[in-house]
């Protein structure tokens, strides 16, 4: 008899579309929740079980602590018992902050900083030799090189960039007889110090001695140095207050020389004041490169963005930031330049000489130009150098305070590696410290796989003392690297920015971090961890999930992957359909048991009763026309040449990190877009040549970014259906009688919307210790419109009622109105019949947003010359939804278009006409074309990881 506490018992769950369901989830097991997209899987896993677990934990904290945390709303459920503390690892990407990297998220970089601080050896950038500490005698010799009569201060830096009031330290200095301090750059009497803010960082130096250098000093200098070094833990500053007049010297007034008993280069004078973890942090002023402030990149005004289309003339607006020279001042400036340098502003910019272009962009230097400015009857003549477009933009960027103007100027900027730190983000002081000939920036730039290999041989290169100090640090680093390898992220580098990671990658990084934490007794809720993962790496991911379970945790995974289902201890199938047609528990048990449930669509596919069929023949394309990309070398691409047959369904495959997105999105898509839309601000990866663009008229990347940033955007507005709905309402007799225009039926502008909630339908109430509460607007009752607008009805329904309809209901309602029906039927075709047409864009998942975009494309009149690119369109899709999606994609191809998908899903790959397999591995070992051809060709290639798994699907 199984005891009750062996289950998480959910009773009466009614969140979103869940239909009062009861479910028992085995504790300390690996459980998969599956079902069609929109069936209610996430509603059960995240919005009910995780939300309640998190809410109970937060409610147990003090009210003071709760105000700093986001409180989950209480889910619509009668009871949940047996619940553990819950941790959600979802698809939302990690921080977009450029300072957040793979190394900082996983904490490996923190251990690396500690390792370098404790066993790293500093080397002089000038000589390449190890840096040794200075003795007091060596310091005296350096000071004696200053001209006689030089007035200096000897300073002991007792506080360097720390917060506090330092009352005790100052009291001790008083007792020792010191009279003067330099506090935050100001010389102060010790009895008359400014009050220090304990929450701000301060610098305090003791003036140990004030000396005028001459022969008669004797031992005074050495004694003062020793006192200063003792006060400041081996560091002292010498500040040159005054140099003797008429003496030529390399030294300067107010110059500071740092002396350290620790590290200093006697040849170049390069010194390290400390080797502490903070100097290896690019998020600390003590470690960050001063030029790029730890970002590793510099931004500059780019000539190609300032003049994106050189085919037009200056007069017609070639210089984009200066507009179409409509400003009289700008036009007269350019005319004066043209007269002086003998060029025309009416010819294409490309035909101007390189010298003229350089002068336009960078200025005329010291050469003065005669400018005539006319203001009515007045004429002003000025003779001065021309500043140049780029220097004038830089000056404007530096002096302007308007955020809007700064954003406008940013459109003309590109980025490149910081020239000071070579993109490593750190000061020279940090980059001169090395272990086994590598500085920390070089180590962070290695792939996880290369890093694991480097660390496995590192022990041989450390001496006994270093090994003793580093033993525990090395254990922590190698453990974390192993976990990252196990979740298929061996191709990432520690320096990779978090904002550039896909949802699947960031989720697996957090998964690896959780295993590293070693927690037990926790409920982990994961959202499709297999996304973005090649079938080859899936086994390692499943083993990782099992290891998490074996630590004594309950692992609850929302997943569609068949292999994961077969390996799970228990499966809960939610369905049978999506939206209102879902929300019930259809089947429970292991994979074999699920197969026997007739109502379970998942069971039908697992048992083979229903399948995605392999096409009987493959398309060959349009008259052998193709797009050819030659010599692609961005990121890890190794001088790649590819040919994409037009009029086909082409799949780009390969293991994670092999270079698929670099090839298709960063190079092909951006290069084609730049050619087809000259004003687009995109930066393609490097390539030699792109041929065949004359055969297409547009290239569209249908990605998973939101269809809108505000709750006002919805599927009806995005697809254009709402425009036709509003037009229809305007034509109704009652609307005409009242004189209503189209704006009357918009919730974005004044007129017809409810002004109490400004068309949102909800009013936000801020709660101090609780989450913000959204309540229905009591004026419009959540309908968004005012009473007069809602009085206009079609078939008994107001415009607010129509926005609340699902796509399926709206199709039936408008079946006699072709303009509206055609927009809605495409939403249904892509499997979104369950969503409400007025559903807020912010509540749509990435997969749903992508399919709304696909529906919009389907509803357009096809030219048959469009190239569509989709990056993993199966994200978040059940196998039955994938079947529907494939019909839509093949329909686009049948209309004459070309569809290019980057995909790991073998059910999609097997239906492709043509496959380009990139690899063979990820990272440095990828970036090559392994094989191209039909699915049968790929399956026959022994070197292709994709081919090996695809073979089983073709049999």
UniProtKB/Swiss-Prot annotation:
GO terms for biological process: nucleotide-excision repair; SOS response. Pfam families: UvrA_DNA-bind (PF17755), UvrA_inter (PF17760). Keywords: ATP-binding, Cytoplasm, DNA damage, DNA excision, DNA repair, DNA-binding, Excision nuclease, Metal-binding, Nucleotide-binding, Repeat, SOS response, Zinc, Zinc-finger. GO terms for cellular component: cytoplasm; excinuclease repair complex. Residues 322-601, 621-951 form the ABC transporter domain. ATP binds at residues 35-42, 654-661. It is found in: Cytoplasm. A zinc finger (C4-type) spans 754-780. Disulfide bonds: none annotated. It comes from the Bacteria. GO terms for molecular function: ATP binding; ATP hydrolysis activity; DNA binding; excinuclease ABC activity; zinc ion binding. Belongs to the ABC transporter superfamily. UvrA family. Forms a heterotetramer with UvrB during the search for lesions. The UvrABC repair system catalyzes the recognition and processing of DNA lesions. UvrA is an ATPase and a DNA-binding protein. A damage recognition complex composed of 2 UvrA and 2 UvrB subunits scans DNA for abnormalities. When the presence of a lesion has been verified by UvrB, the UvrA molecules dissociate. This is UvrABC system protein A. It comes from Rickettsia felis (strain ATCC VR-1525 / URRWXCal2) (Rickettsia azadi). The lineage of its organism: Bacteria, Pseudomonadati, Pseudomonadota, Alphaproteobacteria, Rickettsiales.
